[in-house]
């Protein structure tokens, strides 16, 4: 199996990629819709800075998705959240679906 099957990506989120900071606050790129499987389960995850933070949702996307940490994401119910971090999950040729795990605040 190469990639997570498209029929599993039942939800759509809108991602505004984080581009950096300015004197007026964070800068985001243009919004784009991303097909994902959304799991709204609260758990503790580690941020890129090493802090333990609470993630309220995890989205699973196709492995080629580009979602930088600190990007803004709008979930199907309208909740706007921030990407804590992402993790590429590659089975290395095993019969597991490769995907991108997106941990959301």
Describe these PLM feature segments.
Residues 6, 19-105:
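Short, conserved turn/kink motifs that form compact alpha/beta structural patches or helix kinks used as
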Residues 8-17:
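A short, Trp-centered hydrophobic/proline-enriched beta-strand micro-motif
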Residues 1-8:
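N-terminal intrinsically disordered, low-complexity, charge/repeat-rich segments that act as generic
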């Amino acid at each position: 199996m190469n990639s997570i099957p498209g029929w599993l990506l039942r939800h759509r989120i809108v991602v505004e990629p984080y581009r950096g900071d300015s004197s007026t606050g964070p800068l985001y790129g243009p919004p784009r819709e991303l097909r994902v499987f959304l799991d709204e389960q609260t758990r503790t995850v580690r941020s890129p800075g090493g802090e333990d933070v609470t993630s309220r949702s995890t989205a699973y996307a196709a492995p080629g998705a580009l979602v930088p940490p600190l990007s803004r994401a709008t979930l199907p119910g309208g909740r706007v959240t921030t990407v804590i971090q992402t993790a590429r999950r590659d089975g290395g040729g095993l019969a597991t679906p490769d995907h991108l795990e997106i941990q959301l605040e």
